[in-house]
Amino acid sequence: MALDGGTGKVIVAPDASDVSELEARSRRRAELLADSAGEGATRDGHKVKLLANIGTAEDARKAAKFDLEGSGLFRTEFLFLDRDAAPSVEEQTETYIKVLQAFGQRRVVVRTLDAGADKPLSFADLGPEENPALGRRGLRLSMERVDLIDQQLEALAAAHQAVEGADLWVMAPMVSTIEETEWFAERARSYGLPQIGVMVETPAAAILSEQILTVADFASIGTNDLSQYTMAADRMQGELA
């Protein structure tokens, strides 16, 4: 029996020709992987960074072993979920240091706390909402619980200072207005953080992206939520997929 992991096919009682073809494809794949080091690019020469999505320091350690150019999304909410109190500045700093150390001088894009709606926090309950998905989630929660965002920015700044050569980028989730962008950018820059951005996850942010980028250094398109809010369709509801 032979299993072709590339196509998902199982060959029962493979003959010599089947085995020869599979071995040749396996060698070709190994050659391509061995020659895949360096910057990512399309066949016609356009550079495309290969960046990992991570949620923990362990994710960072595992991802950094591969020939990636860094992390394009560090979901920090996993530090905050399923606990009775927010992580301390010291605990957060320790985690961020581990992540930055894992990637060395490669880029790490950190998303600040993205909670609310489907990711509630017991220690940051702002009360019931009729429609949490359109309520105080993402940056809106941080703007009401300034203590949480300030502690996180302080920890990120401390980690950045502690890891020489770290390429840290920090962005806010669920931004919809210029005013929200200005609020976050001013606050983050006050901690000395070098690259400040926002997630484009709402139609409003997409429409205002040109103006937003006069304030923010970069923007990251959150395709899941942007598609969901644009199409008014819950991405978790199979009937609407």
Predicted regions and their residues:
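Conserved glycine-bearing catalytic or ligand-binding loops at nucleotide- and phosphate-handling centers
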Residues: 1-20
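Conserved alpha/beta-domain cores
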Residues: 29-241
